[in-house]
Amino acid sequence: MDGSSFLDISLDLNTNPFSAKLPKKEVSVLASTHLKRKWLEQDESASELREELNRVNSENKKLTEMLARVCESYNELHNHLEKLQSRQSPEIEQTDIPIKKRKQDPDEFLGFPIGLSSGKTENSSSNEDHHHHHQQHEQKNQLLSCKRPVTDSFNKAKVSTVYVPTETSDTSLTVKDGFQWRKYGQKVTRDNPSPRAYFRCSFAPSCPVKKKVQRSAEDPSLLVATYEGTHNHLGPNASEGDATSQGGSSTVTLDLVNGCHRLALEKNERDNTMQEVLIQQMASSLTKDSKFTAALAAAISGRLMEQSRT
């Protein structure tokens, strides 16, 4: 029997159907979708990073602007404080403020609120009210001065001046008298091109003594030191009355200064005497005026009538 005569009874069945490979088109589609998904995820993360970066940049810009405003405000406040400190101390602590002299009316010497102009009498109620208010103010000041301790008024009333020789090239305005002083201001006055320095005694916390030092306008080789008040503590050498100034080999004590101070007191006494003479001459000339005496008599009679009514 011939082999070609046998029949092929094989069914050609595929026992592993999943082992077949996918077509190339399907593989490319899957790869592209996977890449697109990754790209989308990367784009989302990149956009989030960009938003975060923009937010941080805006916050940084705001903080920079705030810092610039704070620095500007600080500089303005600092400059304002320096201006206040430079002009506040000399203006507040200065005691010798020049007072403008005015011509006093004749009635001010006599104490009556009478206004005279070209021989005419002007007796108004406003002047009487002003005089009454002035009297009340004086009584109030007297009561307050009585309540104050005697030491306080004594400290304010005591003023002494010391003249210290120094070199004209020295601009320190320092007078060494043994005490410790704290400088709180300096100012240029009208009557002297040299500045005036203001000091406060720091030897004791509660010491009220103040010192003003300025070069003399008449003699630039002298320093004029003015002391106001009395020390409430012992001095460095247990003697408060000594005011010694040492500048190189030159020493000036109060014995030297008292002479200059005495001359100043004598000058003030002469000025007061001259003022009294002028007042007496003015009073005598006014009493000779018949119109003035008539106005004065009318004012006195009016005042007496008012007092009798009350």
UniProtKB/Swiss-Prot annotation:
Its main location: nucleus. Residues 170-236 bind DNA. PROSITE patterns: WRKY. Gene3D superfamilies: WRKY domain (2.20.25.80). It holds the Pfam family WRKY. Residues 82-145, 230-250 are annotated as: Disordered. GO terms for cellular component: nucleus. One of its GO terms (biological process) is regulation of defense response. Keywords: DNA-binding, Nucleus, Transcription, Transcription regulation. It comes from the Eukaryota. It is found in: Nucleus. The keyword Transcription applies. Induction: By salicylic acid and pathogens. One of its GO terms (molecular function) is identical protein binding. InterPro entries: WRKY_dom, WRKY_dom_sf, WRKY_plant. The keyword Transmembrane does not apply. Belongs to the WRKY group II-a family. Transcription factor. Interacts specifically with the W box (5'-(T)TGAC[CT]-3'), a frequently occurring elicitor-responsive cis-acting element. Positively modulates defense-related gene expression and disease resistance. Constitutive expression at high level causes severe abnormality in plant growth. This is WRKY transcription factor 18. The gene is WRKY18.
